[in-house]
């Protein structure tokens, strides 16, 4: 019976090692996904802010161009 326990024990230990490895991989994938989601949100926020600033600059340029075209002074 001892000879039968040895392969069974080895299989059990291998199964636990596999489960631990899978847990490490799963945890790492979750951390990567969390980072990517956070990075995405940060980029979207920064791009939205940049877009607002560019839109304001474009409007200001259009306003200045219109005043220059009409010959008005800018002061």
From Swiss-Prot:
Q: Which cysteines are joined by disulfide bonds?
A: none
Coarsely, its chief localization is: cytoplasm
This protein's GO CC annotations: cytoskeleton; SCAR complex
InterPro entries referenced in this protein's UniProt entry, alphabetically: BRICK1
An MF annotation (GO) of this entry = protein-containing complex binding
Q: Give the protein's function.
A: Involved in regulation of actin and microtubule organization. Part of a WAVE complex that activates the Arp2/3 complex.
Which PANTHER family does this one have?
Answer: PROTEIN BRICK1 (PTHR33668:SF1)
Protein's UniProt name = Probable protein BRICK1-A
Q: Which organism is it from?
A: Xenopus laevis
């Amino acid at each position: 019976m001892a000879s039968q326990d040895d392969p069974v024990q080895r299989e059990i230990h291998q199964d636990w090692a596999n489960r631990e490895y899978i847990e490490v991989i799963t945890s790492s994938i979750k951390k990567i996904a969390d980072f990517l989601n956070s990075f995405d949100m940060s980029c979207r926020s920064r791009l939205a802010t940049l877009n607002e600033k560019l839109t304001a600059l474009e409007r200001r340029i259009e306003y200045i161009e219109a005043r220059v075209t009409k010959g008005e002074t800018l002061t």
